[in-house]
From Swiss-Prot:
It is a multi-pass membrane protein. The gene is atpB. Belongs to the ATPase A chain family. Keywords: ATP synthesis, Cell inner membrane, Cell membrane, CF(0), Hydrogen ion transport, Ion transport, Membrane, Transmembrane, Transmembrane helix, Transport. It is found in: Cell inner membrane. It holds the Pfam family ATP-synt_A. This is ATP synthase subunit a. Its main location: membrane.
Amino acid sequence: MAEPHEIDPIHQFHIDRIIPLHFLGTDVSFTNAAFFMLVIVALASLVLLAGTRNHSLVPGRLQSIAEVSYEFIASTLQLSSGRDGMRFFPFVFSIFMFVFLANLIGLVPYTFTVTSQIAVTFGLAMIVIGTVVIYGLIKHGTHFLGIFAPSGVSPLLLPFMIMIEVISFISRPISLSIRLFANMLAGHITLKVMGGFVAGLLGAGSVYALVAPLPLAMVVIFTAFELLVAFLQAYVFTILTCVYLNDAVHPGH
């Protein structure tokens, strides 16, 4: 019987240096994570440019992808933040495309899932919250701080409500980043373990290979499920971004 091949489900999340770089004593190396982030940006740009270059009454595949993506994000943003929120469309659309493609590319063998890194997801979440705070203060001034003081609250309870709202606001980037990070991490680990189990059965030969088709079918089904999760997590991240942006656009609502 063949020796079982050890498969480490965590190794796929290891960050490797491609080009070692140091600046003022700080490691700023170009890594596999940075490489695949560039790939994601390039891929999104190519698809959208190709899809919007030549318009036709009967759209091709790339034009259909571009149009459906545009309409989907535009309707989501308008429903969450109203017409005034449409000024954030380029920002929200970029967030959705980046997260969705990052999730999808991570399912391709020998690639890297950048959204499985808490530093990446937390960075995205901080960009969202930072945009909300900066725009809210510039547009509404101190009136923006009214989001921490709900109207109609008794003056006796107001200090407690302000404290609760502040804690809730501070926790937004934490929950936003952990939700995406944890789902991508757990899904890819499970997929790797299941794939390793199937490979082990096939490599063992004899009677073990006869039962391999069952777990193999489960891997195929779980991969399809992960494709759905890739979209759902991008959608959840996007819809929450729209909801948070609504605080900056309409701080009194």
